Amino acid sequence: MSNGVFEHSYASGSPDSAFYIGQCYPCKVILDDVTGAYSGLGYSGTNSGGDMYIVRSRFVHNRSGMSTTTFDIELYPPGRDTAIIGNLVTDSGLENEAAGFYATETIAGNGIALVGTHANLLERNYIARSRNNGILVLPLLDRHYWPATRHVVRDNTVVSSGRADLAAGGLGTLHNCFAGNRYRTSLPWGLEILNGCDGMRVPIASDLSADMTFFGSIAQVFTGSFKVVDYRTRPVPPPQPNMPGGPQAPVVPAVHPFEDHTLGLDSIPQARESP
């Protein structure tokens, strides 16, 4: 998909991705006020980016909340230049809740995972109750080695993660910065201190345990030891509001939907979880 907008949409119960954008650069795609639930991945973007925005959305009860990845098997690597702003990402990796299959299991349990991608922006998101990591930055080894680099992770709230709220792995995880985040735990320790956005960065500040968890998940896939949840058993989505005007609303051709959509990036609030 390129040059398009998903808005006010609900997707649930997919063994793969509730929402997926892949193989485009620049994509010119906006996801605004969407919900992805009970799926292998709430949002997945492979080899996508460039004028790419995911804003004001909810990704809940998925194997993995959101991921941007790079794979040699698809066109236009690496994934890069995606803005993820003001989203709610909760309850990622609870095995009895979300549908899934082998491909989604490799990064299960992470709220937002940036795997082998470049220059993404994570800002004002709220990530809670991830089984493994709230935010994970990790390189990827495919036919080529894809470092995770030049990401900006700032002003996010990350709570109640199983391993770490903020995690950076791999020896090639360089030139990423973390600033202004509200969190309790990080791997490695002092991630914001050693890799801040306005000061000195120490390139050795990464943690190989994140890589071991990733490779352990791959081993589970190859041995068939991960739990498969049938998508047909997932909760039926609740009634959703209809489009303005209902079936009688006038049909307007989407000639240039990306340009016509008002993003208002500076006015997007910090995402919060409803009480």
Predicted regions and their residues:
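Glutamate identity and glutamate-enriched acidic tracts
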Residues: 7, 74, 95-97, 105, ...
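A short, structured loop/turn motif at beta-sheet edges
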Residues: 121-126, 157-160
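Surface-exposed substrate-engagement region within the catalytic domains
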Residues: 129, 144-152, 160
